Amino acid sequence: KSQFIEMFGNPLSSKQKNELKRLGQCCIINPRRPNIALCDTDKVSFIPMPAVSEDGYLVDMADEEYGKVKKGFTYFENNDVLFAKITPCMENGKGAIAYGLTNGIGVGSTEFHVLRPINGISSPYWLLTLTRMPIFRERAAKNMSGTGGQKRVSASYLNHFMVGLPAIEEQRRFEAIY
């Protein structure tokens, strides 16, 4: 995170060397599931919330038949960023880059938001590090809705969140040292 700040400055500051953009212009938030040419018996990766660490890594995943998990779960693909949207997982830093998914496809907890990098605009490593920054999570926590222990960060909040977007070349340099 300190390397991130050193390279890009505070991405949440109103004083930016990078152009301010809505996060929804930097990535696709909760992309639609495409028509998939998989059979119900084909395997995909299943990633429940406990399989995502508070350190930004996937710690466990299992293969499941697509037919058993194609409904009722959050869909994602390799290089998508998973962001825990519910208390206390969001505040604790749960999030990771989906990678090494069986058939390139994963499904998991409905309590994930999916941030899909846009080719030529954003890197999964930049998105993950941004969303794991304490200041990002503190602001997100202040904008949660719901009651008691069931508060969530909305997709609308993420979509409209303003951030300084560095050039993709800078993001790739960061990715190389990540």
List the predicted regions and their residue ranges.
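Short amphipathic beta-strand starts and helix->beta connectors
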Residues: A98-G100, N143-T147
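Non-catalytic DNA-recognition/assembly elements of restriction-modification systems
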Residues: K1-I36, I168-A176
